[in-house]
């Protein structure tokens, strides 16, 4: 099975428009295309940040790496991905990688079949190593992306 590693170099930000990729893509840096929302109070929920009216609070990140320094804020990353493949293509396993191991809390949210965002993975340095979906130094997550469809991925970092 072939894999795509979507690398969030040192913690890549979220994007303003969908990033297109196809079966020939092997590495897709997202730092300059993701969007970031700083939640200073840490009170925003996935229902709030994924609502259309909330979209203007996200800012496009213009650097390769997100560097928030030492902060008590929660950071939400938003990544819009568009898997360019014929709708009849066989499902593939894609990987999202955060190449920045020192994160205390990290949550991945994906839409369910009704488009409602659900927590699909929770991990981080504050949790046991076994909490990682794929046991590797960087954080790796499988993404079930459907051929020919755009998907928005949310990451909550604290």
Model-based region annotation:
Residues 6-9:
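Small-residue packing motifs within transmembrane alpha-helices
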Residues 11-15:
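N-terminal signal peptide c-region/cleavage motif recognized by signal peptidases
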Residues 18-158:
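Soluble non-transmembrane domains of integral membrane proteins
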């Amino acid at each position: 099975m072939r894999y795509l590693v979507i690398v969030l170099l040192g913690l890549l930000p979220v994007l303003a428009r969908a990033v297109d990729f196809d079966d020939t893509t092997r590495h897709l840096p997202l730092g300059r295309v993701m969007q970031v929302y700083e939640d200073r109070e840490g009170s925003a929920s996935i229902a709030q940040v994924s609502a259309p009216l909330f979209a203007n609070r996200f800012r496009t990140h213009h650097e390769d790496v997100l560097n928030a320094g030492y902060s008590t804020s929660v950071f939400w990353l938003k990544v819009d991905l568009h898997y360019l493949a014929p709708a009849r293509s066989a499902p593939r396993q894609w990987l999202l990688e955060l190449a920045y191991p020192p994160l205390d809390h990290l949550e991945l949210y994906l839409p369910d079949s009704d488009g409602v965002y659900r927590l699909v993975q929770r991990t981080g340095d504050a949790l046991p190593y076994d909490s990682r979906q794929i046991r590797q130094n960087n954080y790796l997550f499988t993404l079930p992306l459907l051929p020919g469809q755009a998907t928005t991925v949310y990451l909550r970092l604290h």
